[in-house]
Amino acid sequence: MIQITFLAFALFLAIEGAIVVFWPAWAKKKMADMQGVPDRALGVIGLLFIASGLVVAGLTDGIIKIAAVAVALEGTLYGFLPTLMKRLMAAAVQCSESMLKVWGETALGIGAAALALFY
């Protein structure tokens, strides 16, 4: 289970990094839009991500299981730390697109390397 969680975290980094690298303007717009969502609503959505991710992970195997655990991990961030996530997104909105792309490339590189090494 630890390996699946590690691979899910690597997949999460790779996906989120790819989104920011290839579509930085869209990512900034979505992060700015998230500032208007109440913390409680973000927490409930996070808990739904956790529940759905764990149900799918229990029913599947292989890469789908890893992807489902990645959804549950993202739900954990939004479900239990909504204020922190909004604060991080607010900081990302304030930075330039080139800086955002650097952070995205870093996340994509770490995630892709971990997936290549450990899957």
Residue ranges: model-predicted function:
Residues 1-5:
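Feature marks short, highly hydrophobic, charge-poor N-terminal signal-anchor/signal peptide-like helices
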Residues 6-8, 27-38, 67, 88-93:
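Short juxtamembrane and helix-loop transition motifs at transmembrane-helix boundaries
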Residues 8-28, 74-75:
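N-terminal signal-anchor/start-transfer transmembrane helix
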Residues 23-30, 76-90:
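Transmembrane alpha-helical segments of integral membrane proteins
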Residues 43-54, 104-111:
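Core segments of transmembrane alpha-helices
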Residues 56-79:
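Short alpha-helical packing/oligomerization segments
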Residues 83-106:
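Interfacial loop-to-transmembrane junctions
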Residues 113-119:
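Juxtamembrane boundary at the C-terminal end of a transmembrane helix
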